From Swiss-Prot:
Keyword Isomerase on entry: yes
InterPro entries per UniProt: NagB/RpiA_transferase-like, Ribose-5P_isomerase, Ribose5P_isomerase_typA_subgr, Ribose5P_isomerase_type_A
Entry binding sites for substrate: 26-29, 82-85, 95-98, 122
Protein keywords: Isomerase
Name used for this protein in its record: Ribose-5-phosphate isomerase A
EC code(s) of this entry: 5.3.1.6
UniProt entry tagged with the keyword Isomerase: yes
Function, in words: Catalyzes the reversible conversion of ribose-5-phosphate to ribulose 5-phosphate.
Subunit structure as annotated in this protein's UniProt entry: Homodimer.
Catalytic activity: aldehydo-D-ribose 5-phosphate = D-ribulose 5-phosphate
Family in the record: Belongs to the ribose 5-phosphate isomerase family.
Name of the coding gene: rpiA
GO molecular-function term, one example from the UniProt record: ribose-5-phosphate isomerase activity
Length: 225
């Protein structure tokens, strides 16, 4: 599985060209993309500016010598490569398993060519088997948790090393164990209107293409946008 992730990540780096502003994703598959961009910067003299989606990716990019700017210093991003936890046939996806969904969505929204790299196990008919992350402000988080509980969403606060996980933006994450999300657009819209919800892991209609690595090689799926 790890080899498939590496193949997909390295393949995605082919979309990066000199002079681009590049969104650097977070997670186990995006890691290999960032490594390949770093290799090209060091060995080929590739001239790019990176915009990162988490503190982890920032540290990785700095170690590789990739020049960085903050999202506030750029008007748009030419290409962003990131992973995804699930992708459905309509190119909707769940992201945020690594806890970076807010920064990932901000960068993705400003990206001209948004690419996901996944192994074939992430391609599903219906979203929802993977728990849906919902990033919430700390104030009133318990109230939101109870509300999700009443609605039957099977919520759980994300924890790390036995303590409540805090995102780079100092928020909590409530993971919803929904099983199935038949209408991700409607569910995402509902969460968008929940006071106290900062962002959620439904990335609906955002991606331009998905690079899928499987036992039979690499497939590139183009979204009809």
């Amino acid at each position: 599985m790890e080899e498939l992730k590496k193949i997909a990540g390295v393949r995605a780096a082919q979309y990066v060209e000199d002079g681009m502003i590049v969104g650097l994703g977070t997670g186990s598959t995006a890691y290999y993309f960032v490594e390949e961009v770093g290799r090209r910067v060091q060995e080929e003299g590739l001239q790019v500016i990176g915009v990162t989606t988490s503190s982890r990716t920032t540290a990785q990019a700095q170690a590789l010598g990739i020049p960085l700017k903050s999202i506030d210093e750029v008007d748009s991003v030419d290409v962003t490569v990131d992973g995804a936890d699930e992708v459905d046939p309509n190119f909707n996806g769940i992201k945020g398993g690594g806890g970076a969904l807010l920064m990932e969505k901000i960068v993705g929204t400003l990206t001209k060519d948004y690419i996901w790299v996944v192994d074939e196990s992430k391609m599903v008919d219906t979203l929802g088997a993977f728990r849906l992350p919902v990033e919430v402000v700390q104030y009133g988080a318990e109230r939101l948790f109870r509300e999700f509980e009443k609605k039957g969403y099977k919520p759980s606060f994300r924890e790390y090393d036995g303590v409540r996980f805090v995102t780079d933006m100092k928020n909590f994450i409530i993971d919803l164990d929904l099983g199935s999300i038949p209408d991700p657009i409607a569910f995402g819209n509902m969460l968008d209107h929940q006071v106290g919800v900062v962002e959620h892991g439904l990335f609906n209609g955002m991606v331009n293409r998905v690079i899928v690595a499987g036992k039979d090689g690499v497939r590139i799926l183009e979204a009809n946008k």
